[in-house]
Amino acid sequence: MLKEVRPAILVMLALTLITGLLYPLAMTVVAGTIFPAQAEGSLITRSGQVIGSALIGQEFKDDKYFHGRLSATTAADPNDSTKTVPAPYNAANSSGSNLGPTSKALADRLKEEVDKLKAENPGQPVPVDLVTTSASGLDPDISPEAALFQVPRVAKARGVPEASIRTLVAQQVKGRLLGLLGEPRVNVLALNLALDAAKLQ
């Protein structure tokens, strides 16, 4: 019996060692050597302080900043552990809203957001990504169209010409990966940091 079981035990121990210890350690070393910033979470710092990650969206409410996609992340209800409460941009609880296309709550929220954005920029079509959440609820990027839609508000709040803000947006647009994958996008945190750093006139 032991003769038949021994090979299985040895294979299990060998695979556990390889896949559970050696491979993860090797990948950690390789990632830390070749892609140190990404391995640390693509953190963004200002004046030596970590202010965010290029991979996780943040909430910007001030009119002088570009706003990202809406977030549907939640947290446990402190009064009832069987329920959740909205907790936007909560990276510990990444998730979508799970509201389907027939949901009245979703339709009402979309209408409210669209109406608010139309009032902000009358006559312009509202980009879809400004009123919808992503699957993770934490997308850090918006489309170039969503960024350009917000230019009049940001320019007015900062008292600078729209053309200066448009130029800055154009500089922050990232193209498709390898020219094929994904869509052009703008990282909202990077754009807002560039906005603060720029001497716009």
From Swiss-Prot:
The protein's name: Potassium-transporting ATPase KdpC subunit
Main location: membrane
Membrane topology qualifier: Single-pass membrane protein
Recorded superkingdom: Bacteria
Compartments where found: Cell inner membrane
Gene Ontology molecular-function annotations: ATP binding; P-type potassium transmembrane transporter activity
Function: Part of the high-affinity ATP-driven potassium transport (or Kdp) system, which catalyzes the hydrolysis of ATP coupled with the electrogenic transport of potassium into the cytoplasm. This subunit acts as a catalytic chaperone that increases the ATP-binding affinity of the ATP-hydrolyzing subunit KdpB by the formation of a transient KdpB/KdpC/ATP ternary complex.
Classification via Pfam families: KdpC
Region called Disordered, residue ranges: 73-103
Cell inner membrane among keywords: yes
GO CC, alphabetical: plasma membrane
Family that this chain belongs to: Belongs to the KdpC family.
Polar residues bias spans: 73-84, 91-101
InterPro entries, A to Z: KdpC
Organism of derivation: Bradyrhizobium sp. (strain BTAi1 / ATCC BAA-1182)
Assembly and binders: The system is composed of three essential subunits: KdpA, KdpB and KdpC.
NCBIfam families reported in the protein's UniProt record: kdpC (TIGR00681), PRK00315.1 (NF001454), PRK13999.1 (NF010603)
This protein's UniProt keywords: ATP-binding, Cell inner membrane, Cell membrane, Ion transport, Membrane, Nucleotide-binding, Potassium, Potassium transport, Transmembrane, Transmembrane helix, Transport
Residue stretches spanning the membrane: 9-29
